[in-house]
Amino acid sequence: MAALRRMLHLPSLMMGTCRPFAGSLADSCLADRCLWDRLHAQPRLGTVPTFDWFFGYDEVQGLLLPLLQEAQAASPLRVLDVGCGTSSLCTGLYTKSPHPVDVLGVDFSPVAVAHMNSLLEGGPGQTPLCPGHPASSLHFMHADAQNLGAVASSGSFQLLLDKGTWDAVARGGLPRAYQLLSECLRVLNPQGTLIQFSDEDPDVRLPCLEQGSYGWTVTVQELGPFRGITYFAYLIQGSH
């Protein structure tokens, strides 16, 4: 039922992109790199420079900022967004966080990475993004979230964000989703937090996360509803 619900809601979840193309995603394999290259190459609606799956940064800053404040032992705090696409999560943290953050967004779509680097640096007719804290930084890298060896060493990030990436990867089979989770936990600091944002029901997602996150604490928080849809933040945390 949760999978069916995701497909039915898919067109309404695509913010800042071409809706006819977004609607066709319900019939596609969301683990297909070429699909996302085509999606990220679509013209944006109006002046919106980003494309958000589910929701944007503003809807979850109330959850993220307290976590950043609690984890100020590392300054700036290292944040990794896996499967960042052209979402506003990375740019929102960079431009709006009052706490110093070192944000890295990775995606397997070179089209998405090129778009976000252009947005960061200020492409034609655009102003470069300015940090919310003078010590903050933002970078984007072309990389597969299921193999982060070229991105980071073990335990190097204090906060990991996954907004819809598990959902997309799992469409290619649960073993791939578990590989994604394993890589995220490998590069996560033992005292850090991984957050998966999804509309998948807890009775479906929690058993998977508990199985794949042995030794970590798994909890869930309800988010929204946003535009009539309830979402969930699945938090996987080490010892604090």
UniProtKB/Swiss-Prot annotation:
Transit pept. (range): 1-28
Pfam families listed in its UniProt record: Methyltransf_31 (PF13847)
Classification via InterPro entries: Lys/N-term_MeTrsfase_sf (IPR051419), Methyltranfer_dom (IPR025714), SAM-dependent_MTases_sf (IPR029063)
Main location: mitochondrion
GO cellular component, one term: mitochondrion
Superkingdom in the source lineage: Eukaryota
Keywords: Methyltransferase, Mitochondrion, S-adenosyl-L-methionine, Transferase, Transit peptide
Stated family: Belongs to the methyltransferase superfamily.
Its biological purpose: Protein-lysine methyltransferase that selectively trimethylates citrate synthase (CS) in mitochondria. Seems to conduct trimethylation in a highly distributive manner rather than in a processive manner, and thus introduces a single methyl group per binding event.
Protein's recorded name: Citrate synthase-lysine N-methyltransferase CSKMT, mitochondrial
Lineage, top ranks: Eukaryota, Metazoa, Chordata, Craniata, Vertebrata
